[in-house]
Amino acid sequence: MLTHTCLLQQMMDDSGIKNSDPDIYIYNIAPDLLTIHPDIDARRTHSINRFIEAPLEHKRTAYIMFHLLVDDLAHYGGISLKYQDGFDPHSSGYTYLRGRQLIESIMELHNIVGKNISYNEAAYRSHLIIEMVYDLVILSHIKRNGSIQLLEDAIHFTLDRKGNEFCADISWLYGIDESHVRDVLKMAASYITKERLDRIMNIEGRIRLFTDKFGLKNNNAVFAEAISTLFQNALSSIENEDFLQQTAVTIRNCGWLPTD
């Protein structure tokens, strides 16, 4: 979420657009944000064509497309005109390439607590770990840009002042009931807070997110040491911030432009 935000901030600055309303940053995280609703899954929010020509009244959906273009580069290694269906554990996307060396450790980690996990599922979880720790790699950018405070301000701005337009745009793009979209905004306003996000901007916070997501919380000391080593290795596997810069260049070259 914060990598997406930081990257869009960079793109807006590079485009010379300084005063956009902050709701664009909620559009930008919408494909992930919408999945907090129990009736909306990630396949629905990610499986749309990347270059839909939106009518003027729905022009802010361009920032949703920005998110999907970033995901394509992270997951597949290139931008696709259409959604790539099916899961490939051998994907050449950045997060899968970086995560590949973690797969065996992830399988061993689950064995410690008596849980079975397939190679494919371990590969999927490896890319999530890379995504989780990448926020820490670019933490200096996030702090310098005020990305965390921006997100908190943006969710309240969207809910309070742009809720009708946001709900209508999401409904147009995805066919999701506007009442569900408004529920998502209300739920998001309660957890996208600077206080909460600051608490998870470290290895320990990322481990908590991972264990909560996959039901792995336990008091096993061997597990605790193993998962700490796993996340430290993930962080060490990312040598620099090249993905951030290369992604910005690739998306500019494909013709994506801010709509303000």
Regions found by a protein language model. Give the residues of each.
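N-terminal leader/auxiliary helical segments
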Residues: 1-260
